[in-house]
From Swiss-Prot:
GO terms for biological process: cell division; protein folding; protein transport. It is found in: Cytoplasm. Its main location: cytoplasm. The gene is tig. Consists of 3 domains; the N-terminus binds the ribosome, the middle domain has PPIase activity, while the C-terminus has intrinsic chaperone activity on its own. Belongs to the FKBP-type PPIase family. Tig subfamily. Residues 170-255 form the PPIase FKBP-type domain. Disulfide bonds: none annotated. It comes from Mycoplasma pneumoniae (strain ATCC 29342 / M129 / Subtype 1) (Mycoplasmoides pneumoniae). This is Trigger factor.
Length: 444
């Protein structure tokens, strides 16, 4: 039995309106069930609880509540089939979630519902082919890869004392130092027995290079300036004076990896590699993927800023704002649960009411939706498509890189689980391909 009839379809500037007449039999049955639910605990003098005759109970019902509950029940029943109607499913501009719902007719005999589905706005994207200051996508260089390998070796290195020499680049200086600004000690720039690798650029310009040549027991004063872009607002560009004493000099003694010892350097999840060459092949793939991801993320921040500053949409669909703001709130509640902090306490610590947080989320949601709509529009213009082959290839690549030694059965299960999140994987690939295309235009 068809639960409803699609009576009329009207496309407006911002919405697609569907007029839906609920099947008469379904409407009657739904009212009967809701009547039973509402009267099962009803109390009337002379009858036991729940034993009031239906014909008598109906006279005591709130008719508006009965119709409201019945309407919600049929909406819940028909909504998913309604989303599969060709007029919605075949139109990629229709936003399926959170339609506005109204009633053309609602009484004991008839129920005609109006569903207003938001439409994706039509607009021209900003000039995405000439965004300044984007970084090109560059393959992993040998020196970058060797540095990552060396970092693995360094983790197994041993510190040895070399205090009988003058401090040089790459040495580890053990220092006591006091920083003063305007003649007053700055606690955040003061420490004892601090281990500083010379050349690491961990401190402000001139500090590390100013220590080179010192010997243990030497004292030195450095007059420097905090950089103009220093993170502490009150210290930006200010002169600072450091009194420093060198207490010890250390070096990291490193044994290079080779075929006989490489497994000693690898964590448990990589012990399945049978040769150093085999590990290096895998590790190169891993480091390359991470470098690409960092490049895409850094560029994505700049692309987003450009789009938000240069995009004017005719409107932003309320349904998308609600969808995104709800997602943000769920993520915030999940984070509180992860840290085992009551959500209300987290709000109190942030000095925000729930209403204030939701308003902030709505503002962020508007920006997120705007960015997503522009990226989708560019993907359409550039005819960027993601088919099942690309989705399967992406899933296989993720499993191969993240889980190199899972057995075939577990790999099959992981593939199946990720395939259940097909829409999410598709959105990631589409975003990556679109970001890559924008970078290529702007860096060539």
């Amino acid at each position: 039995m068809k639960q409803y009839k699609l009576v009329n379809t009207t496309q407006k500037e911002k919405t697609l309106c569907l007029e839906i007449a609920i099947d008469t039999k379904l409407w009657k049955e739904t009212q009967q069930k809701q009547t039973q639910d509402l009267t099962k605990n009803m109390k009337i003098k002379g009858f036991r609880k729940g034993k009031v005759p239906p014909t008598l109970a109906k006279d005591y019902l709130d008719r508006a509540e009965l119709l409201q509950r019945s309407a919600q029940a049929v909406i819940d029943a028909i909504f998913q089939p309604l989303q599969q109607e060709a007029v919605i499913a075949d139109n990629e501009n229709v936003i399926e979630d959170f339609p506005t719902i109204d009633f053309k007719t609602i009484n004991e005999n008839d129920c005609v519902i109006l569903f207003d589905f938001d439409l994706v706005p039509q607009f021209e994207p900003p000039d995405y082919k000439h965004i300044k200051d984007l970084s090109p996508i560059v393959p992993l260089k040998d020196e970058e890869f060797n540095k990552e390998l060396h970092n693995i070796e360094k983790n197994k290195g041993k510190l040895v004392d070399v205090s009988d020499k003058a401090l040089a680049n790459n040495d580890i200086a053990v220092i006591d130092f006091v920083g003063k600004v305007d003649g007053k000690v700055l606690e955040s720039a003061t420490a004892k027995q601090y281990e500083l690798t010379i050349g690491s650029n961990s401190f402000i310009d001139g500090f590390e290079s100013g220590l080179i040549g010192m010997k243990v027991g030497d004292k030195r004063q450095l007059k420097l300036k905090f950089p103009k872009d220093y993170h502490a607002e009150e210290l930006k560009g200010k002169p600072v004076e450091f009194d420093i004493e060198l207490k010890a000099i250390k070096q990291l003694e490193i044994t290079p990896m080779d075929e006989t010892n490489f497994k000693e350097y690898l964590p448990a999840q990589y012990q399945g590699f049978n040769s150093l060459k085999e590990f290096k092949t895998y590790f190169h793939k891993l480091v390359s993927a991470k470098k690409l991801e960092i490049t895409l993320q850094e560029n994505s921040v700049k692309i987003r800023q450009f789009f938000l500053a240069n995009t004017t949409l005719p409107y932003i669909p309320d349904s998308l704002i609600k969808l995104e703001s709800d997602r943000l709130l769920r993520a915030q509640k999940d984070q509180a649960e992860q840290y085992k902090i009551p959500f209300e306490r987290l709000l109190a610590a942030s000095k925000l009411s729930l209403e204030q947080l939701q308003q902030r989320n709505i503002k962020e949601a508007r920006d997120n939706v705007t960015f997503a709509l522009v990226m989708k529009r560019i993907a359409d213009v550039e005819k960027i498509k993601v088919d099942n082959k690309k989705i399967h290839s992406e899933i296989e690549s993720i499993i191969d890189v993240e889980y190199p030694f899972v057995n075939a059965e577990l790999k099959k299960q992981m593939f199946h689980n990720m395939e259940q999140q097909k829409d999410f994987v598709e959105s990631i690939i589409l975003n990556r391909l679109t970001t890559t295309k924008i970078i290529e235009y702007s860096t060539h």
